Each structure stands twice: as structure tokens, then as C-alpha cells.
Amino acid sequence: MPAPRAAAAAFLLLHLVLQPWQRTSAQATPQVFDLLPSSSQRLNPSALQPVLTDPTLHEVYLISTFKLQSKSSATIFGLYSSSDNSKYFEFTVMGRLNKAILRYLKNDGKIHLVVFNNLQLADGRRHRVLLRLSNLQRGDGSVELYLDCAQADSVRNLPRAFSGLTQNPESIELRTFQRKPQDFLEELKLVVRGSLFQVASLQDCFLQQSEPLAATSTGDFNRQFLGQMTQLNQLLGEVKDLLRQQVKETSFLRNTIAECQACGPLSFQSPTPNTLVPIAPPAPPTRPTRHCDSSPCFRGVRCTDTRDGFQCGPCPDGYTGNGITCSDVDECKYHPCYPGVRCVNLAPGFRCDACPVGFTGPMVQGVGINFAKTNKQVCTDVDECQNGACVLNSICINTLGSYRCGPCKPGYTGDQTRGCKTERSCRNPEQNPCSVHAQCIEERQGDVTCVCGVGWAGDGYVCGKDVDIDSYPDEELPCSARNCKKDNCKYVPNSGQEDADRDGIGDACDEDADGDGILNEQDNCVLTHNIDQRNSDKDIFGDACDNCRMVLNNDQKDTDGDGRGDACDDDMDGDGIKNILDNCPRVPNRDQQDRDGDDVGDACDSCPDVSNPNQSDVDNDLVGDSCDTNQDSDGDGHQDSTDNCPTVINSSQLDTDKDGIGDECDDDDDNDGIPDLVPPGPDNCRLVPNPAQEDSNNDGVGDICEADFDQDQVIDHIDVCPENAEITLTDFRAYQTVVLDPEGDAQIDPNWVVLNQGMEIVQTMNSDPGLAVGYTAFNGVDFEGTFHVNTQTDDDYAGFIFGYQDSSSFYVVMWKQTEQTYWQATPFRAVAEPGIQLKAVKSKTGPGEHLRNSLWHTGDTSDQVRLLWKDSRNVGWKDKVSYRWFLQHRPQVGYIRVRFYEGSELVADSGVTIDTTMRGGRLGVFCFSQENIIWSNLKYRCNDTIPEDFQEFQTQSFDRLDN
């Protein structure tokens, strides 16, 4: 077939083939965007903006395949503003509510919600979800949700979506599924245009066809079209070869004519009138014969002289022609390079570029058609998964020329950014990282914390024996935490590990703590090296450690902590106002405000609105007698006139927004306009203002308070009160001393020493009954500590208190070593029995001999003390033995339970005890005629959660009443 005819036939066939394709192209081909975070093909978020705001766009599909554990929640897909984090579009699964929620920004700047109810999406099974949004650029849009290939719900007449997208594509941020343990996202794609049937087939779903026939026949036509295109390609190949042959023939004829010497046009003489005779033309002039010395051949071509002239050999490799004229061969036409690799035609020869990314192989270079046909470039796929392309312990999927990183392997948790770490869970023994001697605790954010059990110490993953129960092991452990170091006082609890002379022996058990050669009992500076023992003021402290060297001050009190004792400091509180002029000498108050004009500043006035210059406070409740009404309707220890919730129990008096209404009775604790509980709440950050309620991971906790719920700059993991910004760590450094028998001189008052930043208290004297009470008040609380009597010379009472409201109202847990009758029989004979006792103190007389004898006595005393529980073993404490106590108090229901451990063994348990005498209060320690008591490793924690055994106790109580 001549070349022109072949070309015309080819183009005619192409036109005929494309005609049906053009007719069916009205059914647009789906455009698919892979949104998986791990996809190597994942698009830039800014690429979505021009697509979604295209005015011709009428169909958008979101397809996903995932598995969520029971009651899990997750944002599957969302578009947000990268500048202010506002939502443009978001699709969220709410597992606990069996709902899915679609949120998108309308034209008026408000968020529109579409709620799909009764969807079982978080049940630990794999689900396929298809979300179809139609007619988005009009005001009558619709949304259809398909679950596991079946339509589950649809909503009509919706406002426009995507119309609120910013005009700046760079300000759009794309967020997808945030994986949690046991959850995974297998597929996430955004599809624009196309038919529902086409998109559903991407999930291997074959829905009932309700599309027009033209749309449903697209698949058959595609197969027909592919066949026709294959035939067309074959025909075009034949035409190409034919054209190449025609070019060669034409070139040969051109060269032959150019070199032909005998060729020339015939000519005729003019005939005579009688004849017509052809006459040969005159002979042309003789041309000179050419030889090889004139270099007639193409460079590099061998030339041979012959009788008739010269003869040229064949063209060099890489060229084609007659030897005289040679043209470069395009070897790239024979496809020597790997598909997708650029072929560079050289003169002569060719070169293949390097293999594509994800492949490996040589860079091929050669000359000639034969070489190009027989030396094809070979590129082999690189298995990136063997080269650590994905993070360790994650799923890696090798693909041709690339790879894809999937979720963490089973048993691991994390992502490709944070890495995959061993999955931890307290519920699964195989995933529990804790020591067999530790308790596994799951925190609010799903983290796992390990805490060594009673009688053991360490970091929780490794635990060793701890005889004195001060949280330091008897021997050093193979871990790096502070609590892995060897206890420097193995048999004496010292949770601060103080060691003044750094000799490796703790001060608590070092007979010469400062290493000056003078035993502690004779040393006037026990913790300061002073061989000379100089003591200028003749008090009990030598000059080397005396904060007032020339003024006698045995209490060594130093209010402002400046190193100068109050006795010799002319500005005790360090507020810049001299004591003689300061209306609060021991409380900083530069403003010197004094509302009632009694010369006592408001900052330290026990009645700031009632004149009471003597500051008398008989019942030690921090409210002066002049304004103390003792009218307390809710029994939480705060009289009605000062209680910020007079009829609601709230001993802590927490008022987060400082509006004068306590959180317990405030509907909006943070005053951000979102109610704590009722719609449009509940507030996902109840204590931190966040009117927009941003919650990126949809876990029910707002972004602003995710890891620090009360925003007190102490993360929840170590915060003892995560929902109270006023309490962060256990600290008894500030305390109130309460003497319970202030009359008489038979004994002396207790001497309290606070160590380890307020987490350890020591009482050194054989004293009258007394309390050291912290200033922090609690509603529900867990209180624990280590109790140790470090002497063998006495056998009296030691313990702790809770629910302290005043010196006549508190709970006390007290332990007597032996049975003993109190030596003062007035006002009545009091007998103490050995063992642990839980008492409710509600004294009508207050501190004095009646309360003193009532505390000593084991049993109830009228108008003074009630015995709530006594350890039936009647076993006293042992000398120099450590015990650990755990108290749970929930004043809102009257729940009390206390347990004691000796080593790791539970030795006493009060069980559930119900009493509502005191509805919350402060914590502290108690002593009565017992010296050298140590309360070590003290810990308290806010906790209003009602323990499970309370419900069991109530059920049993009702059953007994019924019987």
C-alpha cells in the first residue's frame, strides 16, 4: 500500500474508533485521590481546593475501609484551616453513640451537621463505608451513606458544601484517621465525578443499578474500545514500517540519479521535409574519473579504487546509507531502554538514562540497531521493605517501583511518625509490661503506668524488695529511674533519701549525719559540720546552723525562706514592709488592704469583714470567733456565710472561673458559654475556656486540655488532682498545728519536722495529743503513707486524720501498741486497747481533758467520740517496723475504707464503713504520747469516683433489711 493511502486509512480508522468514545465521554471518568497517610502517592492538601470548588462538580464520594474497637471514636477524614484550626469538612464515627457525623462549613460561616443514626461501626469488625454527596454546587444537595455495600441512610435538601473553602489552597490542612490500639484504617479515598456504580466497584461493591443505561453500559464499551485500540496500534505499526521503506527507496533513487553519468535527455534534429529520422545527441564532454585520493566516501568508510573509479564500503555502525552519504540511525526507535526511562539518541549510538526511582539496573549505552535490539536495558524492582523504608515493627508493602507503609504490626502501637512501640494494655496479660510485683494502671489518655506494689520498689517494670516501704529498693535494680537506686536506709523509711555528709548512709539512720565526728544526740547542728559546736545565743542550735545566731529561737521558723529566722528578721514575710508597720507580718501583702479597719490585713485576717484585732479562733477552723457562726447546712466544713455552694457538698471550695459560685453548683465552670453537661454541651474542657470545642481526635476531650485537663502546667499523669488547678503535688510543708490538750504542763506539745518537700513528716517528742494539718481541703480523696515508730521506748498512739473541719470535728485512724489505762482519771477513766481504731470526733467541748480522755479510750464517749471500727486482731504496732496504709473517703456518700499492710501482706481492713458526720475536709497526722514517729512517702489524690464495693455493700445492706 503506498504511504499516503496507508496514512489516510489509519487516520480514518482512528476517527471511526474515537466516535463512540466521544459519545460516551459524557459519563465522566472518576478521579481518585488516595488519602492514606502512609501512601506514597498521597496528594498535597492544597490540590483538593481547586477540585472541590470546581463549579461543574456535582458528585463527591468518600470511600473508606476500617476497623474500630467497641465504643471507639475516630475522625475518618477532615479538612481544616491551618491558621485557626477551624473546620471546613469533617466525617466522624462516634462508636459509643452508634452514630456518624458529617460537619461542613456553609456559606454563612456556620457549621452544618448531618447525623446518621443506628450505625454499628465500632464493633471490632471490618467495615466498608461509602459517603456520596450530590449536587454540591446547588442549594438542594443530598448525602447518602452506604455501609458494607448497602444503603444505610440518606439526607436531602442540604446547604452547599465546599463553598466555604478558602481561596488560598496553602491554608488547607488535611487530617485523617488517628490510629489507636487495635484500630486500623485500610483504605481512604476521595473520588470526584463518576457514577455511584463505578465508585462502588472500587470497594468490590455491586449496587443495584439505578443509573441510565448509557452509564451502566460503560464497562462493556470500555472492553470493546480497548480491543479496537489494540487493532489500531497494530495498523499504525504497519503504516510506520511502510513509510520507513518508502523513505529508503526514495533516498536510493535520489542518490542513483545524482551519480549517473550516462543519463541525459534525448534530443532530435529538425527533420527534412521528406524524412523524420532520430539523431543521437552529441556526446557529452568526458568527465574525469574520481579516485579514493579525493576522499569521496563518508568519514570512516573504507574506499577502494576500481577500473571505473572508486567504490565505498558500508556505512559505520550507527549509520545508514550508500557509503558516500551516511545518516545517523535512531536506535531509540527500537526501544532499547526500560519503559519509562529516557532514551537519548547520539551520533552515533544511543544512551539510556538511569533506572527509575524504586528500580535498580545498569545505564545502557551502545551503537547500532543490532546492539539496541540485543542489549535491552533491564531494571529490577528494589524491595524497599528489606532496606528499612518503614519504621520498625510496622507493616511494609512492596510495590513495583515503590512501597507503602501500613499500620503497626499486631502487638505494637504508634504510626510512621512516632514509630511503632510494643502495645501495652493492662487487660491483656501478653501486653502488660509491668513487673509481676507491680500494679498496671491505664491512664485517661490510654497510656499504661506501672507502679510497684506495697513492699516493692522500682520503676514498675522492674521491682525489688523494699523492707521499709519508702519507695526505694533494698538493693540497686537494673533500671535508670530514681526509685531504682539502693535505699540508703534499708530499715528506716526516708522517702527523700537525705544524706548530709554524702557518705552513702541516709540521715535517718546515720548516727553522725553531718560526719563531723560528733554523734547526733550530742551535736547542736545535726546536719551541718561543726566540730567547734559554738553556740552564741545558747539555744539548741549551734552557730553553724542557727538562722538567728544572736537571738534565741528554738523553733528556727523562717517564713520567707531567706535564711534569716523570724526572730531576727525585720521583714519576716519578705514583702518589703517592716514588721512593725506590716499589718500581716507573716503573710506577704504589699497592698496592706484592711476592710474592717482592725489593723489586721485582709490577707491574714480570720474575719476580714468583722473587726477582731485579737484574731481569736478557739476551734482552729481558720475562721475567727467574731464571725464564726458554725452554721453549715451541707456539712462540708464551710459555714453558709462563706460557702460558695451553701447547700452542695464541696469541701475543696474550687471555683475555677472565680465567679463566686463553686464548681460543684456552677453550670459552666470555666464560663466559656458551653454548659458543663446540658446542650449545647457537654463541655469537652470543663475547666478551660474553649467555646469552639475543638477536638481533633474526637475522644471527647478538647484539644486545649488533652494532656492537662485543668491547665495547671502539670500533666495529668503526675497531677494528684487533674481536675483542680489549685492542687498539683502532695505537700505538707505548710501546715497548721492543733493542740488537743492545751491545759496543764504534764507533757509538751509535739515537735513536727517536715522533709522530702512536704511528703514526709517526723514527730520527735513524747507529747500531749496533737495534730499537724495541711491547709488543702478535699472532697473525695485517696490518702496513703508509710507509718513507722523508730524507737523501742514507748507504746502509745500514732495515726493520721482526714475530714478535718475544726479541732472538734474530724476523723482519726489511730494505733495503740499495748493496753493501757490513761494516767489521769479525770474527768473519767479511759482505757486504751491495742490495735487499729477508726473514730469520728464530734466534740461538744473541743480541745481539753474531755476530748483528750475520749481519744485515749477505746469505745464511744458521749458528745465526744464514736468508734466506727476496730481491728478485731487487737494487735499493736511493732517497734521499728514499717506499715503502709491506704484510705478511701467519699464524703458525698459517706464511704470510708482503710487498709494496712506489713510488707506486702494485708494485715488489717476496715471494709466498707459508712459515716456522714464530716462531709469532707483537710488531711494530717496524729500523735498522742508517742515519740519518734515517721510518716513517710505520703501521697494524696483527689478522687470522687465511688468504689465498686460501695454498691455491693448497699445491696447486702438492703438484703439484710428485707430479711
From Swiss-Prot:
Tissue specificity of this protein: Heart. Up-regulated in the heart in response to ischemic injury and pathology (at protein level). Astrocytes; expressed at high levels in subventricular zone (SVZ)-derived astrocytes and at low levels in cortical astrocytes. In response to peripheral nerve injury, significantly up-regulated in the dorsal spinal cord (at protein level).
- InterPro entries in UniProt: ConA-like_dom_sf (IPR013320), EGF-like_Ca-bd_dom (IPR001881), EGF-like_dom (IPR000742), EGF_Ca-bd_CS (IPR018097), Thrombospondin_3-like_rpt (IPR003367), Thrombospondin_3_rpt (IPR017897), Thrombospondin_C (IPR008859), TSP/COMP_coiled-coil (IPR024665)
The alphabetical list of record keywords is: Calcium, Cell adhesion, Disulfide bond, EGF-like domain, Endoplasmic reticulum, Extracellular matrix, Glycoprotein, Growth factor, Mitogen, Repeat, Sarcoplasmic reticulum, Secreted, Signal, Tissue remodeling, Unfolded protein response
Q: Where is the composition biased (Polar residues)?
A: 642-654
Residue ranges of domain Laminin G-like in the record? 29-194
Q: Self-association or partners: how does it assemble?
A: Homopentamer; disulfide-linked. Interacts with PTBP3. Interacts (via EGF-like 3; calcium-binding domain) with ATF6 and facilitates its processing, activation and nuclear translocation. Interacts with NOTCH1.
What name does UniProt use for this protein?
A: Thrombospondin-4
